[in-house]
């Protein structure tokens, strides 16, 4: 049996495939939650890049674990509060959970860490590509996938810049 598509159906199929091939990747559902205890997290370092100021926060337990040479505990949040021109623009949240690495294939694994972007109102920023976060943070495997992890042992109560 021969299947024949009408010219309109063929055009729709080709247009649809072309559109999807160029469709931008968006945030994906994952296990990351916005920390309910944001006000209890410790601001341990600040990074400044032009008009962007990034405040990094985490739990006292995570700081103590790193200082003791132990792994960051499961359940830990690391939060980057991204300020642009002095105003909160968005949050980047890394969260660690037991077995979370199994959610991704080997090319995307970052230990048991998952990543999510949030708007200032704490809703998920669906315009961000969390695969990009995983890709960059994979280079930091030796420091729990944290770019600022090396600053934690030096933290003594005042944010390090």
Describe these PLM feature segments.
Residues 1-12:
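Bacterial N-terminal signal peptides that target proteins for export
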Residues 10-21:
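Bacterial N-terminal signal peptides
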Residues 28-51, 66-161:
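Sequence context surrounding c-type heme c attachment/ligation sites in exported
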Residues 53-63:
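Short, structured beta-strand/loop micro-motifs enriched in basic residues and often containing a Trp
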């Amino acid at each position: 049996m021969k299947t024949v598509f009408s010219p309109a159906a063929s055009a729709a199929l080709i247009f649809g495939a072309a559109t999807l091939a160029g469709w931008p990747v968006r945030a994906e559902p994952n296990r990351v939650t916005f920390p309910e205890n944001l006000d209890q997290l410790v601001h341990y370092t600040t990074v400044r890049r032009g008009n962007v100021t990034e405040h990094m926060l985490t739990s006292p337990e995570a700081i103590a674990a790193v200082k003791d040479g132990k792994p960051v505990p499961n359940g830990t949040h690391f939060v980057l509060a991204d300020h642009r021109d002095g105003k909160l623009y968005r949050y980047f949240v890394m969260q660690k959970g037991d077995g979370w690495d199994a959610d991704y294939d080997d090319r995307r694994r970052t230990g048991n860490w998952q990543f999510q972007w949030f708007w200032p109102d704490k809703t998920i920023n669906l315009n961000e590509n969390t695969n990009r976060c995983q890709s960059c943070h994979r280079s930091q495997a030796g420091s729990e996938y944290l770019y600022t992890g090396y600053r934690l042992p030096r933290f003594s109560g005042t944010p390090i810049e």
